[in-house]
């Protein structure tokens, strides 16, 4: 997007809906990094600043949120089952209580792979992805040498949360279900822009009359986010 009165001011806008499955934090991690790399390529081509919004299906205390907000994450201290900070059976976030998981995401210096849509996805030290057509026998011929592998992942963009920048916290909740009332939606921006104001989520006092959403009054299980920026 470009301002009509000043076409040199460009905003590259992205929106997403990350996988819901709480147990597949590894796929969520891959998704957000591939998405950020795509936006970075667009920025390199067109210039401007990036805004990224959507349903990330990760909570503010999660490892993936930390990666986006701080720019790096040590996967050796994070389990793929807790990367998104969401639990199916409990209405509270337990990620902070699980600092070091029994099964670390990085168990060995070999690239990890998984089958998804008949393709093998190979993870390297910076989560750059090499995708090969589906085969029963993965080919590690071009793998990164073990001495060059690292458990630290760097995020391709330097982003900040618009809500956290103004409120010093995320708005809560952005999703209201019977067994899960939490924040999973965000508007991220680059520092070249200045967030001026944001739209707050409904208060719990106003939501207490409902057991869950959607319902006859609220048509969605997510609440809208809105941020105003100065470019």
Model-derived regions: residue spans:
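Metal-dependent phosphoester-hydrolase catalytic domains
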Residues: 1-5, 23, 30-33, 37-51, ...
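Active-site-proximal beta-strand elements of phosphoester/diester hydrolases
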Residues: 10-20, 222
């Amino acid at each position: 997007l470009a301002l009509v009165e000043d076409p040199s001011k460009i905003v590259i806008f992205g929106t997403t809906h990350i996988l819901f499955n709480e147990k597949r934090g590894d796929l969520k991690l891959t998704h957000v990094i591939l998405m950020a790399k795509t936006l970075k390529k667009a920025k390199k081509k067109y210039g401007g600043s990036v805004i990224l919004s959507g349903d990330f299906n990760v909570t503010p205390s999660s490892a993936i949120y930390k990666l986006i907000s701080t720019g790096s994450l040590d996967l050796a201290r994070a389990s793929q089952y807790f990367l998104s900070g969401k639990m199916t059976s409990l209405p509270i976030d337990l990620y902070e209580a699980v600092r070091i998981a029994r099964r670390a995401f990085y168990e060995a210096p070999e690239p990890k792979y998984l089958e998804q849509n008949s393709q093998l996805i190979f993870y390297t030290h910076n989560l750059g992805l090499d995708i090969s057509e589906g085969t029963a026998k993965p080919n590690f011929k071009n793998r990164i040498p073990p001495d060059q592998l690292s458990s630290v992942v760097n995020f391709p963009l330097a982003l900040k949360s618009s809500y956290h920048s103004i409120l010093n916290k995320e708005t809560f909740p952005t999703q209201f279900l019977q067994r899960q009332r939490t924040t999973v939606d965000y508007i991220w921006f680059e520092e070249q822009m200045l967030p001026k104001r944001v739209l707050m989520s409904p208060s719990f006092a106003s939501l207490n009359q409902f057991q869950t959403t959607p319902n006859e009054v609220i048509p969605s299980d997510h609440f809208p986010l809105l941020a105003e920026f100065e470019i």
